[in-house]
């Protein structure tokens, strides 16, 4: 059977060649016969069946020399198709017809069923100014039609890749129809593939909802639709729902791209593959090889070698390809596992003579070094330079001949050790040698020499070694000061060329520049330097000491100049986003324009923003978002040696290689920038050279200067400075294609929580930050005493536990929450009349139907008023949960779903409907969509009419006065561009609360939904806070007092629940435990995460010295605002003082680690704290997680049968708060059943626990439930059958398996005194004691 198949393919290939030749000779009346994968309709049209296609993408237009290698490798894996990237010449080098013919011929010869050809230059049209339109792509297809004709059975024409971004994507429908018509009019009969808008992910459902009309626009009905699945498709339900929407209508669909992770989120790749197979649709991964470094994880193979798959490639090969296709024979590949780091070896350095000076760097040898800095703190106990070695020559090089030198100062003589945690060439093939200079030179008294064993092999021309992860330290873990190290570049956190890391072949310097005062390495010798013998160091990792970014080294002040430079190749557009002259944050947003006639590599460009520091402090800068990628933007603070007019500093903005080429006439798109001082003290912008207060929209600002290769080409430096060197004539640069064929990030699928970001460059927009501290060492966890005394008294401390503390903003899979909140940034701009909302800074200020999409509301259902709220509340009713719904108070809501709202469309404009709290007219159940107003009283009345009053069984119980008003100017500048004032917030809160209480007196009013501590403290530096604060120490107390006064005047309580958000700022190893550290499981972060809940309640867990952390968590709040800690007692004291009877809600919170046991421990602790300390309502923010679910269910369903923790808190105390918190409860006033939550959060210390219970009944037995590090499944773990006198003891050994690699096993035995031993792995125990 297999032989017959081969013969048939051979003759079909011959026949295809004949048909192709006949077409070239213009011989008419030839009937094209269908081949494998094709079918012929009655009218002779060949329609390719895409349902059985499985393949990957090949980035041909950037790797034209890899065609044969790539296609053969792809076919060898058994894939039967490939999607090939072409260019029409608009952005990249045009792929000529002859080359396309070769692609087709080679693909046929390899036995592919069909191939897809696509034009990549359309990517992101409408949003990316460098992209071309579909109409321009059609012209290319016409140009190469001659080589496509006759291949209708084999070639699918993918008109253009991801032909719209997120701007103007509503035009996609007509543009696509017009492109199809143009191709058919030109005589194309091929199967045409149509890519979705929204960077291919169709989160707006534009393609889905218009697919039928698109199909009908094709006279041949020979179309297939292509969806790209990345972060938008992060759950199985979203994947299946989208696929079924096409399958159910009989419309052909292909998944043209997908990955296992991406910059925009975590796709559910398992569901994508499963449903593609189940519903029989074509499937193509991204991509074979050649992705840029920041998305290098999407490569299927290493170095184009099919026998060297990456983890992503191996997964796809095993799970997607499997045995579904007949592959070309290939050897079996066994993936090499990532090595577990071994203990760091100690190496004693050997002094060598100090070399003599040299001035010329060597940068033209056969190799070069790419460097990425993985330790950005200048003061640190561990230096982390990650490297790649590139063969830039024309012949292979044996890596054993290569050495690299990293130059630094030791800052205190000690033995040192180095290790490679992982290397693509094999960590065991990397060697280290510490070399001490006989005397110090500039920036170094040591270098670390990195070498390679013979096992590292040959490095081929144009290739690199792949990543080499390395770190080194001193034996006593004392600190280095990297700030003065020759080789350290603080801002280069992604790979780039660092000429201060030098490279040698046979000992001869071939790359980089040694420190001043050093000579090139001596002539080569035949004997390589031996690797020293090493001895292991102890298997401990101390907590690193970290400090803030130091003040930069002063540079000489230049001399005067009067003439600006404005005739260069680039210019700068500037928009001022902080109009207050006195501010703690400067916000210059920029665009760089190529005003020349040739392209320019952005890595050659720097921009300087000149200003006065107004009080010397360490400073930090961040790009919240940039169209070229925020991670591609770098910052450097430069201090002048003496002040000049308008400046004593400048911030230098640079660009990494990933920013790519800037084409003539194009701009970079928006670059959002902000910077601040470490103590958040104010700048006075009024005297700053570069600040133009009134220029809030983009315009030319010649006082923001620009440079190419350090030469001033735009603008005027401050008076008293000299310009950069005079510019020479501009050199025409031939564009080098940046190999970034991956999709531009797409929107996240859940509303982004309001966060307080750290000053590191990120790719996702974030709101205004709160202060980042000068960080001091993380306090060491104290050894636990030999016996932890737990005392429980069921007759004391009885308080009711609110059932509403177990709530969520996003339901956790496997948990039935008792309370639910409809909130977040999306709700500020939600229009209940049409169900549209605006994303604000979270996603391009897009107005769309995202909320409907995320809830599965479509078609006519999406047009029903308040459909989003109804879907939310009906789910709450189904689960008997409390609903808290956000009302709109910022002033405007989305009027349309047309995508991005530009700055010049800021409200008021025709993109917005104005919010009014009272209609002052009869309320309607059919709101007027054309009156330009949205009424809150009409909204509430609609909900009451549908579900009843709050006092009824089905009514909505709580209404929230909008979301995080302290950040409106940051999160929603198109709605509320100016900072909210204290006066405005109170006036709006009072007015809207009166509306609620008038319509539904029993409904609870939540306010003011503050985002975090600086919102508590000063309403995020509200412009009028200092004028209104009086004797109040923080805004919370003033707000409570004002709401109490208004309530007394109105005659009804206007604030039932003080609503706050809390995301801990605690850090371990300078990584925050949530957000950027969400998935971090290093020892430092795990300890910090498990201890972080103490800031909520523990008065001993804080520093005693302002500005210096002597105790408590490592956070800027503890460092500078410890008087306000712990949070819950401080807030409740002010409630009692200023508005007694007000309840407390924490309606957003998260502690990270949702899929790690440390996250489960922290969350279980937090829920216990909420119950014990009287929080009324709480809702976690964040995606589902296995250990997050376990933490909730230990309270809500600990036995899997619906059994719950009690509803009355009783006294429970521990002698060791640091290591073992405890919570206890009973049901009502009946203490015949006692529930105990016992948490062991000690990382590695032996514990013995004695539990002593005071109660009227005598307990005789107990059941133990819990979850462990092996599995988040909560389960029964044992029984205690003979408790005597209400006392029993547990013996808890220290954690097992803690090694230098910092992995956690949480192995614990529980020993009952009465000679009964129950062994299990756990870190959290739930016990139910019974009489």
Curated annotation (Swiss-Prot):
<dbReference type="Pfam" id="PF00942">
    <property type="entry name" value="CBM_3"/>
</dbReference>
<feature type="compositionally biased region" description="Pro residues">
    <location>
        <begin position="736"/>
        <end position="756"/>
    </location>
</feature>
<dbReference type="Pfam" id="PF00150">
    <property type="entry name" value="Cellulase"/>
</dbReference>
<dbReference type="InterPro" id="IPR008965">
    <property type="entry name" value="CBM2/CBM3_carb-bd_dom_sf"/>
</dbReference>
<feature type="domain" description="CBM3 1">
    <location>
        <begin position="363"/>
        <end position="516"/>
    </location>
</feature>
<dbReference type="InterPro" id="IPR013780">
    <property type="entry name" value="Glyco_hydro_b"/>
</dbReference>
<dbReference type="InterPro" id="IPR018087">
    <property type="entry name" value="Glyco_hydro_5_CS"/>
</dbReference>
<keyword id="KW-0732">Signal</keyword>
<dbReference type="InterPro" id="IPR017853">
    <property type="entry name" value="Glycoside_hydrolase_SF"/>
</dbReference>
<keyword id="KW-0119">Carbohydrate metabolism</keyword>
<feature type="active site" description="Proton donor">
    <location>
        <position position="162"/>
    </location>
</feature>
<feature type="active site" description="Nucleophile">
    <location>
        <position position="257"/>
    </location>
</feature>
<protein>
    <recommendedName>
        <fullName>Beta-mannanase/endoglucanase A</fullName>
        <ecNumber>3.2.1.78</ecNumber>
        <ecNumber>3.2.1.4</ecNumber>
    </recommendedName>
</protein>
<feature type="region of interest" description="Disordered">
    <location>
        <begin position="319"/>
        <end position="363"/>
    </location>
</feature>
<feature type="compositionally biased region" description="Low complexity">
    <location>
        <begin position="721"/>
        <end position="735"/>
    </location>
</feature>
<dbReference type="GO" id="GO:0030245">
    <property type="term" value="P:cellulose catabolic process"/>
</dbReference>
<dbReference type="InterPro" id="IPR036966">
    <property type="entry name" value="CBM3_sf"/>
</dbReference>
<feature type="compositionally biased region" description="Pro residues">
    <location>
        <begin position="766"/>
        <end position="780"/>
    </location>
</feature>
<keyword id="KW-0511">Multifunctional enzyme</keyword>
<keyword id="KW-0378">Hydrolase</keyword>
<keyword id="KW-0326">Glycosidase</keyword>
<dbReference type="Pfam" id="PF12891">
    <property type="entry name" value="Glyco_hydro_44"/>
</dbReference>
<feature type="region of interest" description="Disordered">
    <location>
        <begin position="515"/>
        <end position="566"/>
    </location>
</feature>
<feature type="compositionally biased region" description="Pro residues">
    <location>
        <begin position="521"/>
        <end position="541"/>
    </location>
</feature>
<comment type="function">
    <text>Degradation of hemicelluloses, the second most abundant polysaccharides in nature. Contains two catalytic domains with mannanase and endoglucanase activities.</text>
</comment>
<dbReference type="GO" id="GO:0016985">
    <property type="term" value="F:mannan endo-1,4-beta-mannosidase activity"/>
</dbReference>
<dbReference type="InterPro" id="IPR024745">
    <property type="entry name" value="GH44_cat"/>
</dbReference>
<feature type="region of interest" description="Catalytic (mannanase)">
    <location>
        <begin position="42"/>
        <end position="325"/>
    </location>
</feature>
<feature type="compositionally biased region" description="Pro residues">
    <location>
        <begin position="551"/>
        <end position="561"/>
    </location>
</feature>
<keyword id="KW-0136">Cellulose degradation</keyword>
<dbReference type="InterPro" id="IPR001956">
    <property type="entry name" value="CBM3"/>
</dbReference>
<feature type="region of interest" description="Catalytic (endoglucanase)">
    <location>
        <begin position="781"/>
        <end position="1331"/>
    </location>
</feature>
<dbReference type="GO" id="GO:0008810">
    <property type="term" value="F:cellulase activity"/>
</dbReference>
<feature type="signal peptide">
    <location>
        <begin position="1"/>
        <end position="41"/>
    </location>
</feature>
<dbReference type="InterPro" id="IPR001547">
    <property type="entry name" value="Glyco_hydro_5"/>
</dbReference>
<feature type="domain" description="CBM3 2">
    <location>
        <begin position="566"/>
        <end position="719"/>
    </location>
</feature>
<comment type="similarity">
    <text>In the C-terminal section; belongs to the glycosyl hydrolase 44 (cellulase J) family.</text>
</comment>
<feature type="region of interest" description="Disordered">
    <location>
        <begin position="717"/>
        <end position="780"/>
    </location>
</feature>
<keyword id="KW-0624">Polysaccharide degradation</keyword>
<dbReference type="GO" id="GO:0030248">
    <property type="term" value="F:cellulose binding"/>
</dbReference>
<keyword id="KW-0677">Repeat</keyword>
<feature type="compositionally biased region" description="Low complexity">
    <location>
        <begin position="323"/>
        <end position="335"/>
    </location>
</feature>
């Amino acid at each position: 059977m297999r032989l017959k198949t081969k013969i048939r393919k051979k003759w079909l290939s011959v026949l295809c060649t004949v048909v192709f030749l006949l077409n070239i000779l213009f011989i008419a009346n030839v009937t094209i016969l269908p081949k494998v994968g094709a079918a012929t309709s009655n009218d002779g049209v060949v329609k390719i069946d895409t349902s059985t296609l499985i393949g990957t993408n090949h980035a041909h237009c950037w790797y034209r020399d890899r065609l044969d290698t790539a296609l053969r490798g792809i076919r060898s894996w058994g894939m039967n198709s490939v999607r090939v990237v072409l260019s029409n010449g608009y952005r990249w080098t045009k792929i000529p017809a002859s080359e396309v013919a070769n692609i087709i011929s080679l693909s046929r010869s390899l036995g592919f069923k069909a191939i897809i050809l696509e034009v990549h230059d359309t990517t992101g049209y409408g949003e990316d100014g460098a992209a071309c339109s579909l109409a321009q792509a059609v012209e290319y297809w016409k140009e190469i039609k001659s080589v496509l004709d006759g291949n209708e059975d084999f070639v699918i024409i993918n008109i253009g890749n991801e032909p719209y971004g997120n701007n103007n994507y509503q035009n996609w429908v007509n543009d696509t129809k017009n492109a199809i018509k143009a191709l058919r009019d030109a005589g194309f009969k091929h199967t045409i593939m149509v890519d979705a808008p929204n960077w291919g992910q169709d989160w707006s459902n534009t393609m889905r909802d218009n697919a039928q009309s698109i199909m009908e626009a094709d006279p041949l009905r020979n179309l297939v639709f292509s969806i790209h699945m990345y972060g938008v498709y992060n759950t199985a339900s979203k994947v299946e729902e989208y696929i079924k929407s096409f399958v159910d209508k009989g419309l052909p669909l292909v998944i043209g791209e997908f990955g296992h992770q991406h910059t925009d989120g975590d796709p559910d790749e398992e569901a994508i593959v499963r449903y593609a197979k189940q519903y029989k649709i074509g499937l193509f991964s991204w991509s074979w090889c050649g992705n840029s470094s920041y998305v290098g994880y999407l490569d299927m193979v290493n170095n184009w070698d099919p026998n060297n798959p990456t983890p992503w490639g191996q997964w796809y090969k095993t799970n997607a390809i499997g045995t579904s296709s007949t592959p070309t024979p290939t050897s079996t590949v066994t993936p090499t596992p990532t090595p577990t780091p071994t203990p760091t070896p100690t190496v004693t350095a050997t002094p060598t003579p100090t070399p003599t000076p040299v001035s010329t760097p060597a940068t033209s040898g056969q190799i070069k070094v790419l460097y990425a800095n993985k330790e950005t703190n200048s003061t640190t106990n561990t230096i982390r330079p990650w490297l790649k070695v590139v063969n830039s020559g024309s012949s292979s090089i044996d890596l054993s001949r290569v050495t690299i030198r990293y130059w630094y100062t030791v800052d205190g003589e000690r033995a040192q050790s180095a290790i490679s945690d992982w290397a693509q060439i094999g960590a065991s093939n990397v060697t280290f040698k510490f070399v001490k200079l006989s005397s110090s030179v500039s920036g170094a008294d040591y270098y670390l020499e990195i070498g390679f064993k013979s096992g590292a092999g040959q490095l081929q021309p144009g290739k690199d070694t792949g990543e080499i992860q390395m770190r080194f330290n001193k034996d006593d873990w004392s600190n280095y000061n990297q700030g003065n190290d020759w080789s350290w570049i603080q801002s280069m956190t992604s790979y780039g060329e660092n000429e201060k890391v030098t490279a040698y072949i046979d000992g001869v310097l071939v790359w980089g520049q040694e420190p001043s005062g050093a000579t090139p390495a001596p002539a080569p010798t035949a004997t390589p330097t031996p690797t020293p013998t090493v001895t292991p160091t102890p298997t401990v990792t101390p907590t690193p000491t970290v400090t803030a970014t130091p003040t930069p080294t002063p540079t000489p002040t230049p001399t005067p100049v009067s003439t600006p430079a404005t005739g260069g190749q680039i210019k700068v557009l500037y928009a001022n986003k902080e109009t207050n002259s006195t501010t703690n944050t400067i916000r210059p947003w920029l665009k760089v324009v190529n005003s020349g006639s040739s392209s320019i590599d952005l890595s050659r460009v720097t921009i300087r923003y000149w200003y006065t520091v107004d009080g010397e402090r360490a400073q930090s800068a961040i790009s919240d978002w940039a169209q070229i990628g925020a991670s591609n933007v770098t910052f450097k603070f430069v201090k002048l040696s003496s002040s000049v007019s308008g400046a004593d500093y400048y911030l230098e903005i640079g660009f990494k290689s990933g920013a790519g080429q800037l084409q003539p006439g194009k701009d970079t798109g928006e670059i959002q920038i902000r910077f601040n001082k470490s103590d958040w003290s104010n700048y006075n912008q009024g005297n700053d050279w570069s600040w133009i207060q009134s220029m809030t929209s983009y315009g030319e600002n010649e006082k923001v200067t620009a440079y190419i290769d350090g030469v001033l080409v735009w603008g005027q430096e401050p008076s008293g400075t000299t310009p950069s060197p005079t510019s020479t004539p501009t050199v025409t640069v031939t564009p080098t294609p940046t190999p970034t064929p991956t999709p531009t990030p797409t929107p996240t699928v859940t509303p982004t929580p309001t966060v307080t970001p750290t000053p590191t460059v990120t790719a996702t927009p974030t709101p205004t930050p709160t202060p980042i501290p000068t960080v001091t060492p993380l306090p060491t966890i104290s050894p636990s005493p030999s016996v932890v005394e737990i005392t429980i008294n069921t007759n004391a401390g009885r308080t009711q536990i609110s059932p509403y503390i177990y709530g969520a903003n996003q339901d956790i899979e496997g948990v039935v929450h008792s309370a639910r909140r409809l909130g977040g940034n999306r709700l500020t701009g939600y229009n209940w009349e049409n169900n549209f909302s605006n994303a604000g800074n979270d996603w391009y200020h897009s107005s769309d139907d995202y909320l409907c999409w995320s809830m599965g509301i479509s078609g006519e259902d999406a047009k029903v008023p308040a459909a989003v709220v109804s879907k939310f509340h009906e789910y709450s009713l189904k689960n008997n949960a409390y609903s808290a719904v956000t009302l709109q108070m910022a002033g405007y809501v989305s009027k349309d779903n047309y995508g991005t709202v530009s700055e010049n469309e800021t409200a008021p404009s025709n993109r917005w409907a104005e919010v009014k709290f009272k209609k002052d007219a009869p309320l309607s159940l059919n709101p007027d969509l054309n009156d330009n107003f949205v009424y809150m009283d009409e909204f509430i009345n609609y909900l009451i009419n549908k579900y009843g009053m709050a006092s009824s069984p089905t009514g909505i119980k709580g209404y929230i006065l909008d979301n995080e008003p302290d950040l409106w100017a940051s999160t929603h500048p198109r709605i509320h561009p100016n900072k909210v004032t204290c006066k405005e917030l109170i006036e709006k809160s009072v007015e809207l609360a009166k509306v609620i209480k008038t319509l539904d007196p029993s409904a609870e009013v939540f306010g003011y939904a503050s985002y975090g501590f600086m919102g508590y403290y000063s309403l995020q530096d509200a412009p009028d806070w200092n004028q209104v604060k009086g004797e109040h120490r923080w805004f919370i107390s003033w707000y409570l007092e004002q709401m109490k006064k208004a309530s007394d005047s109105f005659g009804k309580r206007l604030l039932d629940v003080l609503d706050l958000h809390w995301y801990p700022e605690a850090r371990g190893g300078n990584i925050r435990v949530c957000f950027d550290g969400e998935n971090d499981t290093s020892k430092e972060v795990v300890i910090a995460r498990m201890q972080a809940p103490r800031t909520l309640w523990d008065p001993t867990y804080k520093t005693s010295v302002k500005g210096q952390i002597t105790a408590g968590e490592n956070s800027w709040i503890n460092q500078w605002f410890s008087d306000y800690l712990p949070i819950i007692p401080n807030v409740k004291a002010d409630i009692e003082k200023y508005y007694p009877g007000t309840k407390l809600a924490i309606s957003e919170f998260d502690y990270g680690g949702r899929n790690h046991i440390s996250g489960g421990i922290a969350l279980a602790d937090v829920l216990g704290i909420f119950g014990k300390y009287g929080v009324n309502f709480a809702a976690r923010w964040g995606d589902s997680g296995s250990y997050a679910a376990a933490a909730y269910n230990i309270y809500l369903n600990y036995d899997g049968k619906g059994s719950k923790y009690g509803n009355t808190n009783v006294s429970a105390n521990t002698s060791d708060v640091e290591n073992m918190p405890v919570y206890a409860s009973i049901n009502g006033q009946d203490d015949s059943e006692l529930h105990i939550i016992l948490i062991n959060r000690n990382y590695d210390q032996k514990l013995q626990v004695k539990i002593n219970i005071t109660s009227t009944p005598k307990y005789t037995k107990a059941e133990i439930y819990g979850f462990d590090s092996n599995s988040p499944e909560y389960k029964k773990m044992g029984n205690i059958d003979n408790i005597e006198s209400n006392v029993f003891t547990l013996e808890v050994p220290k954690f097992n398996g803690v090694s230098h690699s910092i992995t956690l096993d949480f192995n614990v035995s529980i020993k009952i005194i009465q000679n009964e031993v129950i062994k299990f792995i756990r870190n959290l125990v739930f016990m139910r004691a019974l009489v």
